[in-house]
């Protein structure tokens, strides 16, 4: 009887993001640009850490795994959302929905665990520097990462198998842009008590456990930093942990506000917007947050990119680029309003790494600024391209 009920539902309808009427093409261009920047930035970090011998250390090994997890995490939801926007057919099969749940939980939990491992790595490096080489040896580092992969794969599989046994009778509209676990539980006409019990026990342990590990690690780090006598050593310790703290705050802040502290007044649309922060924005910002103050990583990122530069070139920020692209970057830089130091650092970093990537980011920014403009999307995109390329 349960299988008969399940056979009634062969696909779900994803409502997607709450876009204004006539603005879907604009949102498509925006999220496509953000997704391309996410993939490019994270894969550059993986390439740099794999090819540069100076980056063969536990810290960069964990960072490369975090970048891989971010690429897969973003690719679990964003391509399907873009395909639905492009085809205007927001349908996902039952099997596709279960697959999306599995990989979403797998790579989301993997992000969570690797952030905890990176916090422990920073703790050993700052609080126990003399034993760092023996404690964080290559074998132990690899074992920690493999353990993270195995635990998250098993956890995601348990949730997916429990979801597969549920029945969905008539309701098949998912008020989200991807198959969210909690949303599907509300649509089921079966008893979901076992699913909710596993979410509370295992899900809570997999989320709160690594978070507590990060808090404990940074509590010891802060006490150790306060005892540093020199200002230079203090500044170096803070800069080493600052990027990781920024990523942790962004990742856990959005998840805690959405899942652990749900507001009764929050609408479904607001929940979808918050979900964009940890599915799209966090994987996008991770490579930039980790690279802004890391000279070794910046130099490693430049080396493989130089292989793609041919012909008559000149240097921009240490990276050789073609003259036409460099002129485009200079024109775009002159048109940007550098009102804050943070924005200035991000823009200079993009110019330093890849001017083409810089143009994509500026294009995304201008699309977001004109998000609610009444202009025709095709005309607006053409206007924005002209505005970026010509001073």
Please name every model-derived segment:
Residues 1-355, 362-365, 371-381, 385-391:
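Transmembrane helical core of 7TM receptor-like proteins
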């Amino acid at each position: 009887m349960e299988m008969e009920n399940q056979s009634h539902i062969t696909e779900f309808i994803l409502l997607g993001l709450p876009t204004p009427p006539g603005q879907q093409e604009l949102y498509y261009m925006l999220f496509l640009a953000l997704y391309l920047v996410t993939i490019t930035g994270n894969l550059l970090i993986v390439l740099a850490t794999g090819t540069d011998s100076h980056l063969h250390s536990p810290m960069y090994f964990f960072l490369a795994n975090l970048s891989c997890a971010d690429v897969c995490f973003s690719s679990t939801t964003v391509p399907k959302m873009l395909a639905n926007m492009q085809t205007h057919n927001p349908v996902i099969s039952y099997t596709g929905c279960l697959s999306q749940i599995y990989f979403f939980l797998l790579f989301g939990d993997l992000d969570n665990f690797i952030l905890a491992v990176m916090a422990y790595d920073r703790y050993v490096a700052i609080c126990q520097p003399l034993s760092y080489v023996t404690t964080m040896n290559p074998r132990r580092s690899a074992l920690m990462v493999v353990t993270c992969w195995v635990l998250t794969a098993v956890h995601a599989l348990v949730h997916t198998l429990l979801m597969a046994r549920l029945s969905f009778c008539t309701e098949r509209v998912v008020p989200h842009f991807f198959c969210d676990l909690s949303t599907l539980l509300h649509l089921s006409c079966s008893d979901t008590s076992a699913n909710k019990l596993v979410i509370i026990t295992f899900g809570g342990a997999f989320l709160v456990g690594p978070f507590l590990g990060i808090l404990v690690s940074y509590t010891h780090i802060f006490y150790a930093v306060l005892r540093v006598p020199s200002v230079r050593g203090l500044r170096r310790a803070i800069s080493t942990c600052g990027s990781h703290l920024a990523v942790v705050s962004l990742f856990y802040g959005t998840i805690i506000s959405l899942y652990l502290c749900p507001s009764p007044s929050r609408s479904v649309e607001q929940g979808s917007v918050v979900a964009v922060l940890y599915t799209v924005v966090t994987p996008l910002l991770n490579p930039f947050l980790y690279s802004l103050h890391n000279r070794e990583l910046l130099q490693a990122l430049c080396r493989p990119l130089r292989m793609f530069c041919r012909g008559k070139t000149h240097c921009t920020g240490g990276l050789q680029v073609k003259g036409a692209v460099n002129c485009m970057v200079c024109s775009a830089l002159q048109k940007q309003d550098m009102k804050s130091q943070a924005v200035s650092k991000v823009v200079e970093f993009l110019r330093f790494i890849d001017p083409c990537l810089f143009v994509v980011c500026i294009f995304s920014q201008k699309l977001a600024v004109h998000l609610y403009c009444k202009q025709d999307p095709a005309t607006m995109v053409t206007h924005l391209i002209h505005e970026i390329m010509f001073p």
